Each structure stands twice: as structure tokens, then as C-alpha cells.
Regions:
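Flexible, glycine- and charge-enriched loops at secondary-structure boundaries
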Residues: 1, 72-76, 110
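Active-site region of glycoside hydrolase catalytic domains
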Residues: 1-68, 84-104, 126-127
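A residue-identity detector for tryptophan
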Residues: 17, 33, 72, 116, ...
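Acidic-and-aromatic substrate-binding clefts and catalytic sites of carbohydrate-active enzymes
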Residues: 29-34, 77, 105-114, 139-140
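Aromatic-rich peripheral "rim/lid" segments of glycoside hydrolase catalytic domains that contact
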Residues: 44, 109-172
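A solvent-exposed, charged loop/short amphipathic helix patch at secondary-structure junctions
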Residues: 64-78
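Short, acidic/polar
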Residues: 79-87, 116-121
């Protein structure tokens, strides 16, 4: 988009380390599938140092929809196929990818969230894609409760989720 191109041009023209630093560029709405659609094109970058940034709460009915399903047994792992598509579209062509927002809202289903985070980050790590959990501080049961870390109390609410994600990236 013009906005993405203006961003790259402005940062590159600012001088200093800005001429070669990596820049993250979102697709339309930062949507993972939109990033792979022919309507999305990366801006031109003389430094050739762009990273595609997407958000991916998938599958939606598990990850975000309060009224969706709360069990994760791996049977819907096909809903994570966008990771393979991001890899073949970008990673395999020398462009980095960051899933800058992902997570599964708390539905009082910790064990299922751990299994989901394991499947999700194992697949992403194997593809060379970094994931950033959307930690909005919410720990109640229901929509938009993605909290993992108590920043004030300096403790981890759900170490099992964090541990499985770190394990998957440390094994790569």
C-alpha cells in the first residue's frame, strides 16, 4: 500500500541506522490470510530488510470466540495451515514473518490452551516464524482474556503456556 511505501521511504531517509534496520510491515488489517493475497504487495525497500507482521487468532472459534469450542485435541490443526502458507510465501523467499499477535482467550480450559499453544508454536517455530502472545492482562474467563504475566506482581499467571512456547522455540 502507499502507506507502507511511505513508511519505508520515510524511515530509510531518516539516516543513521535507519538505512539498514529491519522494518515490520503489516498486511491489510494485519490479517495473516490477507498477507498472502495477491492484493497485498510488499513495499520496495532498497535495504531488502522487511518483515511481514500479521495477527492470527486461529482457529477463531477456539482462540477468540467466547461461544466457540474450548477443547483442543489437535483435530482442528488444519486451521493452522496459514503458517505453512506464510512460510512458502515469505520465509522461503527470504522475507521474515512475525505473528505479532496471537493467543487463546481464557475459557477455564488451561490444559487445552497449553495443547493449542504447543501445536501453534511448534508449527510456527519449525517454519521460522516468531510469535508474540497478545498479553492484555485479562485473566478472567471469557472474551479478551489473554493475560499470562502479572507485570505489577511480577509473576506468571499461566507458566504452563509460557513454558510450552519457550520449549518449542528453544528446540529449533
Amino acid at each position: 500500500s502507499k502507506l507502507d511505501q511511505d513508511f519505508v521511504d520515510t524511515v530509510r531517509a531518516a539516516g543513521g541506522f535507519n538505512e539498514t534496520r529491519y522494518l515490520m510491515v503489516p498486511s491489510n488489517r494485519a490479517d495473516a490470510w490477507t498477507a498472502m493475497h495477491k492484493s497485498f504487495t510488499l513495499p520496495t525497500d532498497p535495504a531488502n530488510r522487511l518483515i511481514v507482521s500479521v495477527h492470527a487468532y486461529s482457529p477463531y472459534d477456539f482462540a477468540m470466540n467466547e461461544n466457540g469450542y474450548k477443547e483442543w485435541d489437535g483435530s482442528k490443526i488444519g486451521d493452522l495451515s496459514f503458517i505453512d502458507s506464510l512460510k512458502s510465501t515469505y520465509i522461503d523467499n527470504g522475507v521474515g514473518v512475525v505473528i505479532g499477535e496471537f493467543g487463546a482467550t481464557n475459557k477455564d480450559n488451561l490444559e487445552d490452551r497449553v495443547r493449542w499453544a504447543d501445536d501453534y508454536t511448534k508449527k510456527a517455530a519449525a517454519a521460522g516464524i516468531c510469535c508474540v502472545w497478545w498479553d492484555n492482562g485479562g485473566t478472567k474467563v471469557g472474551t479478551e482474556n489473554f493475560g499470562l504475566v502479572d507485570r505489577i506482581g511480577k509473576k506468571i499467571y499461566y507458566p504452563e503456556i509460557l513454558d510450552t512456547m519457550l520449549k518449542n522455540y528453544n528446540e529449533q
